[in-house]
Each structure stands twice: as structure tokens, then as C-alpha cells.
């Protein structure tokens, strides 16, 4: 109830400021999926009518250790509302959690389809591969992924994410132009793609312009 009240206030502030898009995460606990799933839908029963009335777009992102981590399941939740006011955020650095280590970015983006309104670009290693990351105490490395999660947000090319596949699929989906058309599938204006690099601020003067140049080259 407190979270729903906070969200109502967030929506009010967004409307007052003229902000057309809010993005958020599913949150919750992967060890209590049924409870979290029920509470999410209960909350949306109250919030979605307000979101639609105000004409804003709310975008949902699955994050490692959320109650829903898999890309297709997260997309199904967004799709189930059949609302032009809800979108899906795809974070490239979470992709190995989204499909349990396969890294099939083409499938994941295509599955999202018209729900996809926001893409975050950053690289990471495949956490399902042996010794890509080493966590202590050692027994954590052999337990279920619900016990801990680890990933990175490094520059494109520094990890194992298939960015060629991401950009190729986004072009095939006409991601850059889809929301500019009269029959746009969602409200809230243009689709969004941005860089989500963390951890190395001393490299940003070089890496940020390089990322912008690549986005422009690949999509515009």
C-alpha cells in the first residue's frame, strides 16, 4: 500500500513536470515469485487506470534478483495488460539472466515486439559460465541463481553480449522510427535507447562519445 501511494505521487509529479515516460523495475524476490506476482497485479489494478488517464508511459524492466528475471515471462506480464501506456525495457547487461545464459538477443528482442520501448546498452560476462565471476564463500558459486546475482555494466565490446545481433534486430524491428508513426503502438513519444555504463567514470570521456557514435551509425 505504501509503494502504491508513492507511485501515485510519482505520477502526479511526472504530470506536473511534463514528463511523458517513467521507467521502473519489477523488483520483488525470486524466492517468493507467486506472492510478488500477485502483489504486482494487485498494484497495477489500482495504478494502471491512473497511468492511462494521465496519458503517460510506464516502462517495466526485469533486473537480476527480481521476482521475474526471464525476458519472455517479463514481456508476457507487460503484454497481459494490453495497454498502450505500458512498455518493456530491455537491458543488454541483464540479457544472460533473461534467458539463463543463452544470450539469444535476437529472440528476446523479437519476442518483446511492440512492447519494447526502451533499450539500455552495456556489456557483461555470462554469469552461467564457469569462473566468469568468482564469489566467496565458494559454495555460492554452485547454488541456485536465486541466492545471489552478479553482472556488470561495462562498455560495449568488453564482455560477451552480442551487440551486432542487438543492433541488427532493432533495425529489423524499425525500433528507431516505430513510435514516430501515426499508428504508434504506445503513447509517450519516441522509443528510447541509451548507454548504461557503470563502474569506470574515469573512462567516460572516451567511452561515452564512442557509444553515441555507434548508436547513431547503427540506428540512424
Model-found features: residue ranges?
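Active-site acidic/histidine proton-transfer and metal-coordination neighborhood
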Residues: 1-90, 202-207
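Short, acidic/polar
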Residues: 2-12, 100-109, 163
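Hydrophobic pocket-lining residues that define ligand/cofactor binding sites across diverse proteins
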Residues: 14, 51, 170, 174, ...
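Hydrophobic faces of well-ordered beta-strands that scaffold small-molecule active sites
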Residues: 22-24, 58-60, 86-90, 117-121, ...
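Acidic/histidine-rich catalytic cores of soluble enzymes
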Residues: 45-155, 160
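Short active-site-adjacent structural elements
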Residues: 127-130, 201-205
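A short, acidic, amphipathic alpha-helical segment used as a generic capping/interface helix at domain edges
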Residues: 158-185
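C-terminal helical cap(s) of enzyme catalytic domains, especially alpha/beta-barrels
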Residues: 204-220
Amino acid at each position: 500500500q505504501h509503494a502504491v501511494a508513492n507511485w501515485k505521487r510519482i505520477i502526479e509529479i511526472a504530470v506536473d513536470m511534463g514528463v511523458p515516460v517513467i521507467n521502473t523495475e519489477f523488483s520483488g524476490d525470486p524466492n517468493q515469485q507467486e506472492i510478488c506476482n500477485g502483489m504486482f497485479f494487485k498494484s497495477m489494478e489500482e495504478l494502471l487506470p491512473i497511468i492511462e488517464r494521465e496519458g503517460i508511459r510506464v516502462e517495466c524492466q526485469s533486473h537480476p534478483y527480481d521476482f521475474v528475471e526471464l525476458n519472455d515471462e517479463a514481456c508476457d506480464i507487460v503484454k497481459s495488460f494490453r495497454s498502450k501506456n505500458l512498455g518493456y525495457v530491455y537491458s543488454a547487461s541483464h540479457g544472460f539472466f533473461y534467458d539463463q545464459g543463452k544470450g539469444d538477443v535476437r529472440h528476446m528482442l523479437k519476442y518483446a515486439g511492440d512492447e519494447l520501448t526502451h533499450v539500455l546498452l552495456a556489456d557483461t560476462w555470462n554469469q552461467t559460465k564457469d569462473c566468469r565471476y568468482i564469489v566467496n564463500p565458494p559454495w555460492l558459486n554452485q547454488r541456485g541463481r536465486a541466492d545471489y546475482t552478479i553482472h556488470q555494466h561495462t562498455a560495449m565490446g568488453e564482455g560477451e553480449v552480442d551487440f551486432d545481433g542487438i543492433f541488427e534486430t532493432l533495425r529489423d524491428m524499425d525500433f528507431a522510427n516505430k513510435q514516430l508513426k501515426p499508428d504508434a503502438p504506445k503513447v509517450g513519444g519516441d522509443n528510447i535507447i541509451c548507454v548504461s555504463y557503470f563502474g569506470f567514470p574515469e573512462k567516460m570521456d572516451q567511452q561515452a562519445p564512442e557509444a553515441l557514435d555507434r548508436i547513431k551509425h547503427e540506428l540512424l
